[in-house]
Amino acid sequence: LQTRNAKMNAVAMIKTSVDMVNEKLIDKNRALARLHAEQLEQLLHRAIDSKSIKNYTMLVKGIAASPGAASGIAVLDVKRATIMGENGVKVILIREETKPEDVPAFFESVGILTSRGGKTSHAAVVARGMGKPCIVGCSDLRIDYENKQCSVDGKIVHEGDPITIDGSTGSVYLGEIPT
């Protein structure tokens, strides 16, 4: 007989720990010790509804730069994203990369997506500091600012189309997935 420690997300770890305490298999202190700081941090951010995700198409995968999930409309222009966000529209800002002058749009966006960059890029660092979901380094994402659209392998997202980003996994989905 072989045994291994189960790999599970924060919610599953808490549920199994509570069950084990209720069944008197472990005490409360041991249950708390089973949770790692990273797992507790997962609980502080929005997550995609795991039951709904199978009904949506993944567009692209990039580098998970800042945790959390967000749904909104795709916007490629910084000024337009700022104005729309100020008017209560949930916006996902999409850029090849970001620079300091783009920060006003960060405040008004629910999430950021870039085709370039890494975990220490401008978009990643600023988004983490603001607690906004962010995915960077989506190298397969082709951004066409002139036609206000982006694409991956023939799948086109026009500005105004709903998308969902999961900054915890680096996945981008077509449509608005419940979080």
Model features per residue range: what roles?
Residues 84:
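Short, conserved, surface-exposed binding loops centered on an aromatic residue
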Residues 47, 70, 74-80, 88-90, ...:
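Acidic, glycine-rich flexible loop/linker segments
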Residues 1-58, 158-179:
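Terminal amphipathic helices with adjacent charged low-complexity linkers/tails
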Residues 54-81:
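Translation machinery proteins
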